[in-house]
């Protein structure tokens, strides 16, 4: 690890927290959470140990904040997709975008994987609640698209939309959890296509190239991002 990230004023609360979290994130990745004392986080952040303790009760609370921030960002993917629907995008493209955005978020934050694995083992880390909230946001988005498509007669009549949405989302999550963070753009696009196609063919009765536009199926969502 190189020298301090930059000295921060003792009273500069928000920037101090950000700098401490940035330092902890780097150190929790390597050498790892168990091998990182608060003093080392403080040194890399360019602040005193007392300053760290002014903002965090202990090392575990720093880990918990990193995990909460990560999961909040993941949860926002579902909210962003719902609020920023492109009326000219096809329904298939909306599903594909969800998969790609979730994949890129994981790649961009791959350095947090070791810290997240540690947090999963801590009952008070808040990881479980944050994970459930993120899953709910993503699943609800998928289900709303599929239910709207059912209203237009585009889905298989023998499929329970809520059950299928949950099962398919779990499949996507399982696939993304094993994603190589060093995946190339070409690999990302290939995986995105495969997961989107699996969703589509499991639920819809028409080929993806005949997918209607969002403005035809999801008019109740349009304009919310304005």
What are these regions (language model features)?
Residues 113-117, 128, 154, 158, ...:
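Short, hydrophobic secondary-structure boundary micro-motifs
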Residues 72-79, 125-152, 162-166, 170-177:
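Amphipathic alpha-helical packing segments from all-alpha helical-bundle domains
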């Amino acid at each position: 690890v190189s020298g301090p990230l930059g000295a921060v004023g003792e009273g500069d609360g928000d920037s101090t927290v950000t700098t401490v979290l940035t330092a902890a994130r780097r150190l929790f990745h390597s050498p790892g959470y168990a091998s990182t004392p608060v003093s080392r986080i403080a040194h890399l952040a360019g602040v005193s140990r007392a300053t760290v303790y002014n903002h965090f009760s202990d090392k575990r609370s720093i880990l918990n904040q990193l995990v909460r921030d990560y999961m909040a960002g993941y949860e926002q993917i579902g909210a962003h997709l719902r609020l920023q629907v492109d009326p000219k995008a096809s329904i298939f493209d909306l599903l594909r975008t969800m998969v790609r955005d979730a994949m890129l978020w994981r790649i961009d934050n791959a350095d947090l994987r070791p810290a997240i694995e540690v947090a999963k083992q801590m009952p008070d880390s808040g990881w479980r609640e944050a994970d459930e909230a993120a899953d709910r946001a993503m699943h609800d988005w998928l289900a709303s698209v599929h239910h709207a498509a059912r209203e237009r007669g585009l889905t298989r009549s023998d499929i329970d939309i809520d059950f299928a949405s949950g099962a398919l989302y779990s499949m996507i999550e399982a696939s993304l959890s094993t994603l190589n963070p060093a995946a190339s753009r070409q690999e990302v696009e290939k995986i995105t296509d495969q997961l989107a196609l699996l969703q589509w063919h499991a639920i819809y009765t028409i080929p993806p190239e005949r997918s209607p536009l969002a403005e035809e199926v999801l008019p109740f969502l349009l304009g919310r991002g304005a």
